[in-house]
Amino acid sequence: MVDSKTPAKTKLLDSSSISNVRVVLRVRPFLPREISDESCDGRSCVSVIGGDGGDTSEVAVYLKDPDSCRNESYQLDAFYGREDDNVKHIFDREVSPLIPGIFHGFNATVLAYGATGSGKTFTMQGIDELPGLMPLTMSTILSMCEKTRSRAEISYYEVYMDRCWDLLEVKDNEIAVWDDKDGQVHLKGLSSVPVKSMSEFQEAYLCGVQRRKVAHTGLNDVSSRSHGVLVISVTSQGLVTGKINLIDLAGNEDNRRTGNEGIRLQESAKINQSLFALSNVVYALNNNLPRVPYRETKLTRILQDSLGGTSRALMVACLNPGEYQESLRTVSLAARSRHISNNVSLNPKVETPKVKIDMEAKLQAWLESKGKMKSAHRMMAIRSPLMGTNQTSISQSSVKKLLCHRSAIAESAKLAGTGQRDAFVTARNLFGVETLAASHLWEPIRNLQLASPTKEDERDTSGEENLLVSEASLRDNTLDVEKKYTELSPLREALSPIDSNAKPNSAHGSSPFLKPMTPKTPFLSTNPEIMQMEGTCQKFNAWSNNLKTSLIKEYIHFLNTANREELRELKGIGQKMAEYIIELRETSPLKSLTDLEKIGFTSRQVHNLFKKATEGVLEKPVSASTTP
């Protein structure tokens, strides 16, 4: 079982809590080549007052420029000096308390951030004599898996030139970054390797390390050219899965100092771009901006769960003691990251195999009941109004005649013009009108089991009468459907055609669909305020305003409910703008067109966007009609 003396134990048992990103500072020692340099006096530009690495309270970190005597002060959570074993201290005091939560279904993230040559890769990977945070974390998790009978798996990938690549696959396998319906990031195509011992971990992990992109630069002999991410997933007995992400970020580079050219310059540009996007995310979260630019780069999308998401996060800011400017930029972003709050929540339980077996049994039972339901449906059809008063079986000839009437109804619907034809087609358009298909009226006929004709059926003279009664009931159903469609469509608030050709139908009269009449010009519903206006132009303008208001309501409703593909079908909205709209409405639904200005639209652009959408509706051809 998990040690009950873990300091964070009480917090880990909560189903959800608020946790700020914890930021600690690690200053690496001077390298031998730096000590031998005459320009290096061995003095660090970083100092601390107010605590050490063992203190839980915040510390004040001072940066002093030896050339200009400029001083800067920042508040961080902990400070770890230039001791050779300070990585082990960081693990014991910062990373180790996060591990028990993984076995309870929580996620955690540890990322090393800093300039190139500041010791990030050494902090995460380490060497044989001084292991880094990755092997130390794996060793602790494996020992806890033995005690709790849990399983551990690892995945290892890199973000190189803003593309994700699986490092555990022999062949180059690019990973797709996707979002689910809840906004959680998923990596499609990422492989995982079960790990039961440190030897298995070292075998898989070292294979991935060798495949990671590194190169020699002017500032570092072995410089990482990509962001490396090691994911350790744990599945406990209750099938609750938690994971920890160990991220080794590539360092930002000053190409004036490195002298990068060619491919190295392109790599440096992508690295700096992703780190700049990371700083924009930190800025947006600190200032509570309505839009956080997670989607600017693959790196920020991956870190979306760690910065402002649901993971407990630890940032290890790595510094070179002899570089003031680089240290200043690193500590500045790290200090701002401390104020980011994560809403840490418990991962849902995974279905057990027993539940899956039960689901198969339920599926089998459902299939059996489906057959019974069909039989019951047929029995209901026998008792339907189609059978007349005698409740006898309908003959095949009567059904064939009724089906002929159905084809006649379809022909009359075609003659009724595009306006009536659209009322019988189920489709989703810009304004979200979902109409009811006329085929629903024929479900009793479709499910009816035809009986073979008998002599008794041939002698039955009530078949024609039953058919006429059926037609009358179908007409009543049709009127009910049209009434329901009128209630469903919000556009009827502005436009409500009145059928001036409507006449009372007799019980034995033919269906109105069988004798299509010449369509007449529809009239607008009588609004008392508008009808009191004098002049046709004033009335027309009033109806136009009502129509415009209804279109705006439907347009806003569409923006709040449509998915990414449906939004992209609108004129003027591309893929990135559709993603911005989805992010905006997750915070709060759009209430007016001016809300689009929150994602960068100007008022003129919003007007043009709505104009383009309505042009597509108004450009549709209108069927010509004449009045007597």
From Swiss-Prot:
It comes from the Eukaryota. GO terms for cellular component: chloroplast; cytoplasm; kinesin complex; microtubule. Residues 498-509 have a biased composition (Polar residues). Coiled coil: none annotated. ATP binds at G114, A115, T116, G117, S118, G119, K120, T121. Keywords: ATP-binding, Microtubule, Motor protein, Nucleotide-binding. Residues 496-519 are annotated as: Disordered. GO terms for biological process: microtubule-based movement. GO terms for molecular function: ATP binding; ATP hydrolysis activity; microtubule binding; microtubule motor activity. Residues 20-340 form the Kinesin motor domain. SMART domains: KISc. Belongs to the TRAFAC class myosin-kinesin ATPase superfamily. Kinesin family. KIN-10 subfamily. This is Kinesin-like protein KIN-10B. It comes from Arabidopsis thaliana (Mouse-ear cress). The gene is KIN10B.
